[in-house]
Amino acid sequence: MQELRIGVLDFTNVNPAISAGVQRLPGGRAGKPYNPNRRLQDAIKALGHKPVVYKVEKCQMFFDNRKAAILYNNKKVKGCDVLVPRLDFCQGIDLEISIIKQFQLMSIPVINKYLPIARAKNKLRTLQILTKMRIPVPKTIVIRRFEYLDDAVKKVGGYPIIIKSPFGTEGREVVIIESRRSLYSALDIIWRQSQSGIILIQEYVSEATGSDYRAFVVGDHVVAAMKRTAAVGDFRSNLSLGGDAVPVKLTAEEESLAVRATRVLGLDICGVDILRGNGGPVIMEMNANPGLEGISRVTGIDVAAEMIRYAALVAYKNSKK
């Protein structure tokens, strides 16, 4: 098998407030903080390929009347056979990921591509696509004004409810509300800070009891899965917020649902969060930039290596066109 040049598009420091630490998860390894970009590079080398790192802060997009190109440190970029972007921000999404589209315009295969990432980063757009394709999601209503709140709560089944920003990640900007008084107080603060003014009100799936299931999808397969349970006193099961996790075997229905949801969004790689409701599994979240450390540690499966194997396969197929 020939050696490939596999690119890693590193968004670290694009948003210093978020990139200010590649932090270790609770219960993670001692020593250096886990760096997913470094882990991908190590996986590329271990599989016999050459890593090519592009730090976004050093890239310049160039246009003329003939082609689109990328300069790196003001010099023409030597291309790669396939590119794997790693993002670490949730604001200014469309603008920041334009660099991914630029690589696509240079005929470089990208995993994941620009448009699917933009869809997945927007919870509202994700809900629209999943609903159109009849993929089950929690009851959700989108509002902008206080006067619609009471009816909105009734439509999703009453308290408790979940309120979300359209763009939060890792459980941030997600709040459980148990009363009308709490809802009005919380939204007064959230709307003052919100850039979009849009809030998602979602049913609380009580039978999930603070647990969800993360499926790590690569291509058409779930390569790893874990059950996450919220920390005491919280309802969010994200490992980054102190939740606990154990490896799990998903049901055939859940695996099929995760793969199908990934496919309809157009993603190659996705972290799919599933709730087990009384009516069957529902998709809670879709993450186009899923964390690598937690699920690898919990399951013992090297998901970074799985990603690179898939990227190499895409590159080989592309070279034969």
Q: What positions do the PLM features span?
A:
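Phosphate-binding site of ATP-dependent enzymes
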Residues: 175-265
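Anionic group-transfer/hydrolysis microenvironments
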Residues: 12, 88, 166, 204-205, ...
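Protein kinase-like catalytic core scaffold
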Residues: 161, 223-224, 270, 282-284
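Short, flexible active-site recognition loops that position polar ligands and cofactors
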Residues: 292-302
